[in-house]
């Protein structure tokens, strides 16, 4: 009897032992599966967060890996990249120290508490003596973005060209969008350190580079006989590429405007072309503010009337900044095809980042960007159907003391106009995150408050919390202009009296209400004081500017005849 009980007990114990071994084996297999599955997730750039409501620190720190420079004008086919290595980052650091010493030596009498802040932040958490090897820590969130199914540049660019050439036909084309949206890792713009880090990445693109011969030509197609000549590298756009340790998140920072007379600018900077592209993207019609201004394109027809098709063609010209920014993105995508790419930039760089981000459905954080919504519409960039633009992955961060960001730096007496900038737009796409420093700190509205390091040291690092992002207020740019599609004649100007009246009419081509100024009944003639146009019967002798100085005044003209339509 005892023997039978012992046998049963031994049998149960062996069964229990085998069961434990089976459970242990299954647990080991499960851990192996989870381990390899998590590797797959990392390779696909999908980051799993422990808390869905709070941003999590992304794996690995972000460092500068590549610097792009892209030519414009005659050198618009040329693009080069500089890979950051230990050797050249040390050399760049020594150059930065020399530049800082030079600035300190010339800073006598300048109204600045710390000369370093004009070249880099003086905040203790981010201070460094070498911006080229600084390690950034960023947080991210998961967000559903509505993006096109096919976002390959080989599809996007021909579609945009078609939409610009035949907007009516393009409106009938159905674009495939990802059904229900797509989960994408986006910057956590509620985290102060992340916002400051992205702003510093934007400022990094302004830091001057010493001469080096380590640039690689990545132009497509590349032809050694097709060289732009001397000086192209200081006459274009720059993009700085930051990558984390796992190479699954990439941040592209696009350089903004270099303004003559501001710290960090000079003859080796891109002042002239920056101003041309500013005036092309953010003016109502080719920077035609008054008859005293020389236009940056030939689309102005008459008073408050502009050739819309001509304007759209001018913005998309291959030798301008928008195309150059897209080329920088395309080569970065070629190097990191499986990474999630973010865009950032300050001022003009922020606007270009926003335009490229909307083109390819990329998360974008722009700082102090002028209103770019009008430029996005003129470029016929894709907007998700039925989804308001503010519900997308684009954030515009700025403050109330910056007239460029707020859209108030216009008019003949404004500082922008005096400096030769026609900043006439104020409407942003995406969401706006505004610091009210006028109310909170008593700041005065001043164009000098537009500088990136004023924003970083005076606002972003001083506030305890980041600004709340919200949908922009209803906004219409250039409401008093008539934009005529190609082939359409401007309406004759008639009225019952010789006094000037203001009438409200609707223009179908732009699908918005415009205010048109009507004068007495007679054939329109150009202002005799305007040197840019001369009318002969049904033809107009027009002049186009070939070269400008930094103020924007034309120094060389070319003339041509244009038939009135």
UniProtKB/Swiss-Prot annotation:
It is a single-pass type II membrane protein. One of its GO terms (biological process) is phosphatidylserine catabolic process. The active site is at residue 347. Keywords: Autophagy, Endosome, Glycoprotein, Hydrolase, Lipid degradation, Lipid metabolism, Membrane, Signal-anchor, Transmembrane, Transmembrane helix. GO terms for cellular component: endoplasmic reticulum; multivesicular body membrane; vacuolar lumen; vacuolar membrane. The keyword Glycoprotein applies. It catalyses: a triacylglycerol + H2O = a diacylglycerol + a fatty acid + H(+). The keyword Membrane applies. Residues 1-21 are cytoplasmic. InterPro entries: AB_hydrolase_fold (IPR029058), ATG15_Lipase (IPR050805), Fungal_lipase-type (IPR002921). Glycans are attached at residue 217. Residues 519-528 have a biased composition (Basic and acidic residues). SUPFAM superfamilies: alpha/beta-Hydrolases (SSF53474). Residues 493-518 have a biased composition (Low complexity). Binds to both phosphatidylinositol (PI) and phosphatidylinositol 3,5-bisphosphate (PIP2). PANTHER family: LIPASE ATG15-RELATED. This is Putative lipase ATG15.
């Amino acid at each position: 009897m005892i023997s039978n009980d012992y046998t049963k007990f031994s049998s149960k114990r062996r069964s229990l032992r085998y069961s434990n071994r089976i459970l242990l084996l299954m647990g080991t297999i499960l851990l192996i599966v989870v381990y390899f599955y998590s590797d797959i997730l990392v390779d696909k750039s999908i980051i799993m967060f422990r808390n869905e409501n709070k941003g999590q620190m992304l794996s690995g720190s972000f460092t500068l890996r590549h610097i792009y420079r892209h030519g414009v004008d005659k050198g618009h086919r040329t693009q080069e990249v500089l890979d950051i290595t230990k050797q050249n980052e040390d050399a760049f650091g020594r150059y930065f120290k020399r530049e800082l010493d030079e600035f300190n030596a010339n800073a006598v009498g300048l109204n600045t508490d710390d000369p370093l802040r004009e070249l880099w932040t003086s905040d203790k958490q981010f201070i460094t003596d070498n911006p080229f090897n600084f390690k950034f820590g960023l947080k991210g969130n998961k967000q559903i973005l509505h993006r096109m199914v096919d976002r390959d540049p080989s599809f996007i660019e021909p579609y945009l060209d078609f939409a610009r050439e035949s907007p009516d036909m393009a409106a009938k084309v159905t674009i495939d969008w990802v059904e229900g949206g797509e989960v994408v890792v986006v910057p956590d713009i509620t985290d102060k350190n992340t916002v400051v880090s992205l702003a510093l990445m934007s400022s990094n693109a302004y830091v001057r580079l010493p001469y080096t011969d380590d640039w690689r030509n990545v132009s497509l197609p590349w032809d050694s006989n097709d060289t732009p000549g001397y000086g192209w590298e200081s006459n274009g756009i720059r993009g700085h590429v930051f990558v984390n340790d796992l190479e699954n998140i990439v941040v592209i920072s696009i350089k903004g405007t270099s303004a003559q007379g501001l710290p960090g600018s000079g003859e080796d900077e891109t002042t002239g072309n920056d101003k041309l592209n500013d005036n092309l993207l953010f003016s109502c019609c080719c920077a035609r503010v008054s008859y005293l201004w020389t236009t940056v394109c030939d689309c102005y027809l008459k008073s408050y009337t502009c050739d819309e098709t001509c304007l759209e063609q001018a913005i998309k010209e291959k030798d301008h900044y928008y195309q150059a920014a897209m080329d920088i993105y395309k080569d970065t995508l070629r190097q990191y095809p499986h990474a999630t790419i973010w865009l950032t930039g300050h001022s003009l760089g922020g606007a270009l980042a926003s335009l490229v981000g909307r083109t390819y459905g990329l998360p974008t954080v722009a700082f102090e960007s002028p209103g770019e919504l009008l430029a996005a519409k003129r470029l016929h960039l894709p907007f998700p159907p039925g989804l308001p633009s503010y519900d997308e992955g684009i954030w515009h961060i700025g403050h109330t003391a910056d007239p460029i960001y707020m859209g108030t730096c216009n008019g003949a007496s404004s500082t922008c106009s005096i400096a030769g900038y026609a900043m006439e737009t104020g409407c942003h796409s995406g969401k706006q995150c505004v610091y009210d420093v006028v109310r909170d700190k008593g700041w005065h509205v001043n164009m000098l408050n537009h500088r990136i390091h004023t924003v970083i040291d005076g606002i972003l690092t001083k506030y305890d919390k980041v600004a709340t992002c919200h949908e922009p207020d209803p906004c219409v740019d250039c409401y008093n202009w008539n934009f005529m599609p190609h082939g359409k004649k401007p309406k004759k100007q008639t009225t019952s009296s010789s006094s000037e009246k203001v009438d409200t009419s609707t223009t179908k081509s732009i699908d918005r209400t415009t205010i048109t100024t009507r004068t007495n009944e007679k054939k329109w003639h150009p202002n005799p004081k305007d040197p840019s146009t001369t009318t002969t019967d049904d033809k107009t002798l027009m002049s186009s500017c070939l070269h400008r100085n930094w103020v924007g005044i034309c120094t060389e003209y070319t003339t041509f005849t244009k038939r009135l339509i």
